[in-house]
Amino acid sequence: MSINVTEIVLHQLQQTAGETAELHTVLREDLLAISPEVEQMMLQLHQAYQNKAKAYGIFQSESIFAQQLNRLLEGESEFLPFSHSCAKMLATELVKYPFASGGTFILCRYTFLATEYLFIALIDSRASMLVDDKLEVKRTEYLDITQYDIACRINLTELKHNAQSNRYLTFIKGRVGRKVADFFMDFLGAEEGLNPQVQNQTLLQAVSDYCEQGELDSNQTQAVKKQVFEYCKGQINSGEEIAISELSASMPTLKEIDFADFAEQQEYGLEESIPPVRNALKTLTKYSGSGKGVTISFDAELLSQRIIWDELNDTLTIKGLPANLRDQLERNK
């Protein structure tokens, strides 16, 4: 797969020494020349971004960033001054947070698989060693383009054709204890858009309700849920979203209504396609839970067969322990 870089520029955000944290911007005065090395770097950044956990956002009506982006897309401004303004706004927002640090600011407009994107990231540098042509060991620094968590991407194609979309903007979810998502929302002048977790949970509820209205017994219901899970797992493995129409076609029609029509009639608010969330979808075929030093996970089809739930006494009875668990118990009795 190839990537077509249209415009790209690098700037530096440098943290100044002293008691009060400040970020100083070092701005390029021209765009980077587009070379095979530049395109290879952007391809790696694109691929790394694809594999990261992301949240969705939309621009607020008063977003300064969105206003400047619109002028760029309308041809009223150039990419370089736009990038200068972005770097300064990013530094202004980032310095408000305790994790503020410098890095290389990358702003790139590119096309991948007929979709145009604007990619924005702050990349850390890492120290390493190299051996030169005289076999001398020297210290060097390199851009850590696979490990980064301050980045966002705007789907310009979708933004141009559907400004009311709730998913044209994505950004990397921050690590626990870091409000990366918060500062990026402030920098972009954005608010939460599509919530994949909520959409996945709503999908699971819709599937359960569909089976219930179809008057399926527990075994039939579990068979349908397994079908749904297999389709969703295939979408995850191929990097695709859950298409409700495709999912519906893979499911049985119950009471003369297919799943897609049922979901629409019941007004669940499902999108036509949903980014899959693996952990949420696992509950289609598994029961799991942990607490008070106990962790339990088992296939849903085992309930009422090898796993017996006594709701009144709040107990689970397991018939036929896993061999490795039984061995551990015997060794430590």
UniProtKB/Swiss-Prot annotation:
Keywords: Cytoplasm. It is found in: Cytoplasm, Nucleoid. Pfam families: NA37 (PF04245). Its main location: cytoplasm. This is Nucleoid-associated protein HAPS_0704. Coiled coil: none annotated. One of its GO terms (cellular component) is cytoplasm. Belongs to the YejK family. Disulfide bonds: none annotated. It comes from the Bacteria. InterPro entries: Nucleoid_associated_NdpA. It comes from Glaesserella parasuis serovar 5 (strain SH0165). GO terms for molecular function: double-stranded DNA binding; single-stranded RNA binding.
